[in-house]
C-alpha cells in the first residue's frame, strides 16, 4: 500500500517502461508507439490500483460477487475503452435503476386514474341498483302470495247480490 501511494515509485516504473520500449523499438518514427505506451501505462496503473483495492474489498465485504461487480467491471470497461469499444459493460443495478424509475412513472398515472375512477364506478353501481329497483314489472310477474289480505277479497261473481257493495251509489240530498 505504501508503494501504491508513492508517486515517485509509480513515475519511475512508467519511465522504466518507456525506456524499455525505446530500447526495444529503435525506429523513433513508429506510428503505434504512443498507443502501446499508453496501454502499458494504464495496465500498470490498473494493476497497482486494483489488487490492493480488491484485497480490501474482499476482506470488508466477504462477498466475491460484489468485489467482481464493483472492481472488475470498471477495469474491464477501461480496457474496452482503450480497445475502442463504445458500449461499456453494465451491472444489473445500473440497468435496474432506470427501470425502477420507469415503473414508478407508469405506476403514478395508474394510481391517479384509480383514484379518479373509483367514485365514478361507485356512482354507476348506485345508479344501476336504483334503476333495478325502479323498473316496473309486468302484472303477471307480481307475486301475490305475500299479500296478507287475500282471503277477504271477493270478485264480482262472488258477491251475494252480484253488485259490489263498496261502489258508491247515487245520493240525493235535500236542499
Swiss-Prot record:
GO biological process per UniProt: monoatomic ion transmembrane transport; symbiont-mediated activation of host autophagy; viral process
Spans within the Cytoplasmic topological domain: 52-175
PTM comment, free text: The N-glycosyl content is primarily Man(9)GlcNAc, with a small amount of Man(8)GlcNAc.
Parts of the chain on the Lumenal side: 1-28
GO molecular function: channel activity; metal ion binding; toxin activity
First-listed, main subcellular location of the protein, grouped into a coarse class: host cell
The keyword Transferase belongs to this UniProt entry's keyword annotation: no
InterPro entries associated with the record: Rotavirus_NSP4
Pfam families per record: Rota_NSP4
Transmembrane residue ranges: 29-51
GO cellular component entries: extracellular region; host caveola; host cell rough endoplasmic reticulum membrane; membrane
Keywords, alphabetical: Activation of host autophagy by virus, Calcium, Enterotoxin, Glycoprotein, Host endoplasmic reticulum, Host membrane, Host-virus interaction, Ion channel, Ion transport, Membrane, Metal-binding, Secreted, Signal-anchor, Toxin, Transmembrane, Transmembrane helix, Transport, Viral ion channel, Virulence
Residues annotated as binding Ca(2+): 120, 123
Sugar attachment sites: 8, 18
Subcellular location: Host rough endoplasmic reticulum membrane; Host membrane, Host caveola; Secreted
Membrane topology according to the record: Single-pass type III membrane protein
Domain comment, as recorded: Binds 1 calcium ion per tetramer.
Known partners and oligomeric status: Homotetramer. Interacts with the immature particle in the viroplasm. Interacts with host CAV1, early and late in infection. Interacts with host integrin ITGA1/ITGB1 heterodimer. Interacts with host integrin ITGA2/ITGB1 heterodimer. Interaction with microtubules blocks trafficking to the Golgi apparatus.
Role played: Plays an essential role in the virus replication cycle by acting as a viroporin. Creates a pore in the host endoplasmic reticulum and as a consequence releases Ca(2+) in the cytoplasm of infected cell. In turn, high levels of cytoplasmic calcium trigger membrane trafficking and transport of viral ER-associated proteins to viroplasms, sites of viral genome replication and immature particle assembly.
Sequence similarity: Belongs to the rotavirus NSP4 family.
Protein name (database record): Non-structural glycoprotein 4
The organism of origin for this protein: Rotavirus A (strain RVA/Human/Japan/MO/1982/G3P1A[8]) (RV-A)
